[in-house]
Amino acid sequence: MLEHELIVTNKLGLHARATAKLVQTMSKFQSNTTLSTKGREVNAKSIMGVMLLAASQGTVIRVRIDGEDEHTAMQALSELFENRFNEDT
C-alpha cells in the first residue's frame, strides 16, 4: 500500500472536468484508490465521490493506493496533479 499527499494547484480546483480526468485516469488501474481531505474519504474511481471532496486550489489530498499496479497508478495520479490536470497555462 502506498500513501502520499498531493496539493491541488490548478486554479479551479477539482471541478467537474478535472474530476472526470482524475476518475478516468484511476479507472485504468486495478488498484483500489482512496482520496481523503477535510474528514472525508472517497473512492477515486467515483466521480460523485471525488466531487464531494469540494477540493479547491491549495487543498491537500491524502492518497492511498493498494494493489498490484499501485506504483504505476500513483505515478499517473501524481503527474496529473503536477500538470494541473492540463488546464492552466
UniProtKB/Swiss-Prot annotation:
Positions bearing Phosphoserine: S46
Activity-regulation annotation: Phosphorylation on Ser-46 inhibits the phosphoryl transfer from enzyme I to HPr.
Highest taxon of the lineage: Bacteria
Subcellular location: Cytoplasm
GO biological process, one term: phosphoenolpyruvate-dependent sugar phosphotransferase system
Pfam families referenced in this protein's UniProt entry, alphabetically: PTS-HPr
Keywords for the protein's UniProt record, in alphabetical order: Cytoplasm, Phosphoprotein, Phosphotransferase system, Sugar transport, Transport
Ranges where the HPr domain occurs: 1-88
UniProt xrefs under SUPFAM superfamilies: HPr-like
Coiled coil spans: none
GO-annotated cellular components: cytoplasm
Main location: cytoplasm
InterPro entries: HPr (IPR050399), HPr-like (IPR000032), HPr-like_sf (IPR035895), PTS_HPr_His_P_site (IPR001020), PTS_HPr_Ser_P_site (IPR002114)
Name of protein: Phosphocarrier protein HPr
Species, as recorded: Xylella fastidiosa (strain 9a5c)
Gene: ptsH
